[in-house]
Swiss-Prot record:
This is DNA mismatch repair protein MutS. Belongs to the DNA mismatch repair MutS family. GO terms for biological process: mismatch repair. InterPro entries: DNA_mismatch_repair_MutS (IPR005748), DNA_mismatch_repair_MutS-lik_N (IPR007695), DNA_mismatch_repair_MutS/MSH (IPR017261), DNA_mismatch_repair_MutS_C (IPR000432), DNA_mismatch_repair_MutS_clamp (IPR007861), DNA_mismatch_repair_MutS_core (IPR007696), DNA_mismatch_repair_MutS_N (IPR016151), DNA_mismatch_repair_MutS_sf (IPR036187). One of its GO terms (molecular function) is damaged DNA binding. Transmembrane segments: none annotated. The keyword Acetylation does not apply. NCBIfam families: mutS1, PRK05399.1. It comes from the Bacteria. The keyword Nucleotide-binding applies. This protein is involved in the repair of mismatches in DNA. It is possible that it carries out the mismatch recognition step. This protein has a weak ATPase activity. It comes from Escherichia coli (strain SMS-3-5 / SECEC).
Length: 853
């Protein structure tokens, strides 16, 4: 900033601003001046564009006019929300000195830094979504990744081994802000993400990280958290914790532990799979018609966030899953009674985070009190549920009768938004406060009595007593009667139609009232802070209670969904395989106006791969996706949309379904498809569920069929993964004859003239034809084009009548058996008669043949 070059030439106020700005050069500085936050120089220009506010000039400093933009302090939350949504960070600078006693500029300092990943204010957060701060670190052995939800205290770390796993983690967690080292090598992995923050290398040092974490948790080492042997994850976690402390400018008592997330604990889904299955976000980027939109009827925001975490991290521990299933079954008869009470609990988790940060507002404490008031009724309802896990949750949620009583005594029923204006602490809570308030409130009675007395004494019927913030208390007389004002009335203000006066008695009372109001407000703020001190020792138990209430909300919700949507409880088996009777797609069945056609599925070690054929729009993709979604739902402990389900162990779910050009990375549709396919072939195991849809369609017929055949062969024979393989290459329907564990199924359709009816029913065996022209006609392709296509199809079929049945083992000509090209050297030798050559000609031929090789 050019302003700093001639620092001494600036006014004292601008010098103070420039010093503070130098400490926060890369973020906007909101500089408090009276009732406004001002921004200057480049900050003002940026803010005017980002917030669409006026850019003006403020006088001159160092001989130059100062670009300036300002926002009213009482509307700051709205502007902060806009900036945070655009990925910006803001340093809030407040006046901390007293203007009355300050010589020169009032003392100011930055009291907090608002960044997209460290916000806890209710107005700035998405209610039903986690808001994560993350840090990423990389060395020669892999990645370290840490996430922190400052609005709940949830702190996690992991060590993704490779780029694909790291990309999947970024997709799953979707951080609002991402910290990375200044020498981070894989920039293409994070480019284009919101809230990127470059940090110095020293912030990622392992020794500093261990020290920071031990200090935060009050421990000597990190062995108890199971993260001691995760150096890359710790490097990321250390940087992240330091950043959180720097921005909050306070202790973070609600962050009490850190958890290691291990690959073997959950079903792994890569970024493409999460996108294709539309778990919490559809392919267009919205939230409608997703799995979460069907399953999430939770009644608390914290329950909704927990359910989404479950959906993105299906659990592999069958003990946990069976416990959840049993709980859902036990709660089905109680959902109608429990949900209305749970709804009243609200977002206790985030209220507790604001309590820990000492930023909780009066209404937060009122909501906490309301949550506590629901606990006795909840505990009474749960007492009747015959389930050990439910009783464990009931114990964990506690009752907090003492804290409820404290808040009932301390906070009025409907407190104002902020404590700064007073009127928060309830009457009767503090004797001294009540006395000061009585003095201040007595003003109304006094003024009414004074007005009546003075009116009678002077005989002036227009006389009235009032108050305003600038001039204090006054006696007002109309302009027509002002010449009759008594001699002891001192003029204070002249208005167009009236005169305002002061008398010694009124001035004396004004001083007394203002003093008592000031004393009452100061005491009220002190008592409010003391409430934090009384509540914070219970923080750990309160956080456990919030977690139990959120889990109860999720399980009650899943019980309600299971009953309402006619879901069934899946059975877990020991061997790999999935057997589904009458399976349905959980999302499609909700948006269809007609009944959903349920279909069976049978995958086992003896039937590992299904080759799925049938017309476009016939339901192949729906059938494949519903299988993956049923598996995912089973592995969060939920009931599933089917008549009966048996499911074996699954370690990963892969999808290669649909694709679009990745223009940002310069990759074509086919390149995207092949990258996803390579990932599957490298990482799938016999316990993986693999969905392959139309592999090889993005290139020539020969190349595409070759790739599809080889991929199917590899998955069935070598990897032995549970695979659904949809294709339009009818040659692939020969695979079951050539290898074990492969079977054909098809989706039925009926053709009548130029029309086609999709039956959406899965049958054994291969489809008889593709119905491509019928689908094209249905899509509105002009009739003359369809007619010409039928002619061309007949021509092609007459040229190659056996194309659909061609074999790939070489016994007859096929699409895959490309004739070998004859080399020029061989052709020349075939035309050569060695008996007719002279020695010289023979030598020339040797050189000529050499040149042809």
């Amino acid at each position: 900033m050019s302003a700093i070059e001639n620092f001494d030439a600036h006014t004292p106020m601008m010098q103070q601003y420039l010093k503070l700005k130098a400490q926060h050069p890369e973020i906007l500085l909101f500089y408090r001046m009276g009732d406004f936050y001002e921004l200057f120089y480049d900050d003002a220009k940026r803010a005017s564009q980002l917030l669409d506010i006026s850019l003006t000039k403020r006088g001159a400093s160092a001989g130059e006019p100062i670009p300036m933009a300002g926002i009213p302090y009482h509307a700051v939350e709205n502007y902060l929300a806009k900036l945070v949504n655009q990925g910006e960070s803001v340093a809030i600078c407040e006046q901390i000195g007293d203007p009355a006693t300050s010589k020169g500029p009032v003392e100011r300092k930055v009291v907090r830094i608002v960044t997209p990943g460290t916000i806890s204010d209710e107005a700035l957060l998405q209610e039903r979504q986690d808001n994560l701060l993350a840090a990423i670190w990389q060395d020669s052995k892999g990645f370290g990744y840490a996430t922190l939800d400052i609005s709940s205290g949830r702190f996690r770390l992991s060590e993704p081994a490779d780029r694909e796993t790291m990309a999947a983690e970024l997709q799953r967690t979707n951080p609002a802000e991402l910290l990375y080292a200044e020498d981070f090598a894989e920039m293409s992995l994070i480019e284009g993400r919101r809230g990127l923050r470059r940090r110095p290398l020293w912030e990622f040092e392992i020794d500093t990280a261990r020290q920071q974490l031990n200090l935060q948790f009050g421990t000597r080492d990190l062995v108890g958290f199971g993260v001691e042997n995760a150096p890359r994850g710790l490097c990321a976690a250390g940087c992240l914790l330091q950043y959180a402390k720097d921005t909050q400018r306070t202790t973070l008592p609600h962050i009490r532990s850190i958890t290691m997330e291990r690959e073997q604990d959950s079903i792994i889904m890569d970024a493409a799979t999460r996108r294709n299955l539309e778990i919490t976000q559809n392919l267009a980027g919205g939230a409608e018609n997703t799995l979460a939109s069907v399953l999430d009827c939770t009644v608390t925001p914290m329950g909704s966030r927990m359910l989404k975490r479950w959906l993105h991290m299906p659990v592999r521990d069958t003990r946990v899953l069976l416990e959840r299933q049993q709980t859902i079954g036990a709660l089905q008869d109680f959902t109608a009674e429990l949900q209305p009470v749970l709804r009243q609990v609200g977002d206790l988790e985030r209220i507790l985070a604001r309590l820990a940060l000492r930023t909780a507002r009066p209404r937060d404490l009122a909501r906490m009190r309301h949550a506590f008031q629901q606990l006795p009724e909840l505990r009474a309802l749960l007492e009747n549920v015959d389930s050990a896990p439910v009783q464990a949750l009931r114990e964990k949620m506690g009752e907090f009768a003492e804290l409820r009583d404290l808040l009932e005594r301390a906070i009025i029923d409907t407190p104002p938004v902020l404590v700064r204006d007073g009127g928060v602490i309830a009457p009767g809570y503090n004797e001294e406060l009540d006395e000061w308030r009585a003095l201040a409130d007595g003003a109304t009675d006094y003024l009414e009595r004074l007005e009546v007395r003075e009116r009678e004494r002077t005989g002036l019927d227009t006389l009235k007593v009032g108050f305003n913030a600038v001039h204090g208390y006054y006696i007002q007389i109309s302009r027509g009667q002002s010449h009759l004002a008594p001699i002891n009335y001192m003029r204070r203000q002249t208005l167009k139609n009236a005169e305002r006066y002061i008398i010694p008695e009124l001035k004396e009372y004004e001083d007394k009232v203002l003093t008592s109001k000031g004393k009452a407000l100061a005491l009220e703020k002190q008592l409010y802070e003391e409430l934090f001190d009384l509540l914070l020792p219970h923080l750990e138990a309160l956080q456990q209670s919030a977690s139990a209430l959120a889990e109860l909300d999720v399980l009650v919700n899943l019980a309600e969904r299971a009953y309402t949507l006619n879901y069934t409880c899946p059975t877990f088996i020991d061997k790999p395989g999935i057997r589904i009777t009458e399976g349905r797609h959980p999302v499609v069945e909700q948006v269809l106006n007609e009944p959903f056609i349920a279909n069976p599925l049978n995958l086992s070690p003896q039937r590992r791969m299904l080759i799925i054929t049938g017309p476009n729009m016939g339901g192949k993709s729906t059938y494949m996706r519903q299988t993956a979604l049923i598996a995912l739902m089973a592995y969060i402990g939920s009931y599933v949309p089917a008549q009966k389900v048996e499911i074996g162990p699954i370690d990963r779910i892969f999808t290669r379904v649909g694709a679009a050009d990745d223009l940002a990375s310069g990759r074509s549709t086919f390149m995207v498809e092949m990258t996803e396919t390579a990932n599957i072939l490298h990482n799938a195991t016999e316990y993986s569920l693999v969905l392959m849809d139309e592999i090889g369609r993005g290139t020539s017929t020969y190349d595409g069929l070759s790739l599809a055949w080889a991929c199917a062969e590899n998955l069935a024979n070598k990897i032995k993964a549970l695979t659904l393989f949809a294709t339009h290459y009818f040659e692939l329907t020969q695979l079951p004859e050539k290898m074990e564990g492969v079977a054909n199924v098809h989706l039925d359709a009926l053709e009548h003239g130029d029309t086609i009816a999709f039956m959406h029913s899965v049958q054994d065996g291969a489809a008889s034809k593709s119905y491509g022209l019928a689908v094209a006609a249905l899509a509105g392709v002009p009739k003359e084009v369809i007619k010409r296509a039928r002619q061309k199809l007949r021509e092609l079929e007459s040229i190659s009548p056996n194309a659909a049945a061609t074999q790939v083992d070489g016994t007859q000509m096929s699409l895959l058996s490309v004739p070998e090209e004859t080399s020029p050297a061989v052709e020349a030798l075939e035309n050569l008669d060695p008996d007719s050559l002279t020695p010289r000609q023979a030598l020339e031929w040797i050189y000529r043949l050499k040149s042809l090789v």
